[in-house]
């Protein structure tokens, strides 16, 4: 069984040298999403949610490191595969009924929205660049809203 510290080490190493859309270390995002988790399972999945998608690390590599199967299942669901539409990707998470993956995806969207808003406020950019960033913020916000509504509808259907 891996500790939170082991998982953080894996995430930090996987994102070493990577930058986000405004030049900040990409690892800051996965650390933030992990810290948003309400329990160790959500935290571990949050720290690892972009590892398979953004690096050469595979689910089998994580398994070999001792990452628990519950975490691997969530990370697998949270990995956006090439060729899959974003809408289908989110639907797969919701359809899975995997509470960990669903909560981590909501945390991910929430943090993406927050950092895009911060970037818009702090970047010294041209009007065109600001508009592009604003468009991205609105797109993230719309995805967040659609995902939350879809999840809520799915939860209500189960009751």
Regions found by a protein language model. Give the residues of each.
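Active-site helical microenvironments for divalent-metal-assisted chemistry
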Residues: 1-159
């Amino acid at each position: 069984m891996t500790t939170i510290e082991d998982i953080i080490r894996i995430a930090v190493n996987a994102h070493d040298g990577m930058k986000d859309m405004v030049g900040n270390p990409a690892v800051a995002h996965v650390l933030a999403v992990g810290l948003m988790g309400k329990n160790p399972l959500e935290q571990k999945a949050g720290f690892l949610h972009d590892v398979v998608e953004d690096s050469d690390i595979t689910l089998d590599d994580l398994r070999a490191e001792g990452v628990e199967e519950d975490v691997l299942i969530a990370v697998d669901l949270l990995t956006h595969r090439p060729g899959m539409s974003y809408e289908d990707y989110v639907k797969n998470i919701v359809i899975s009924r995997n509470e960990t993956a669903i909560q981590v995806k909501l945390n991910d969207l929430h943090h993406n929205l927050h950092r895009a808003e911060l970037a818009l406020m702090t970047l010294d950019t041209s009007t065109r660049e600001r508009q592009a960033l604003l468009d991205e913020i609105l797109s993230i916000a719309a995805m967040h809203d659609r995902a939350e509504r879809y999840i809520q509808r799915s939860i209500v259907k189960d009751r």
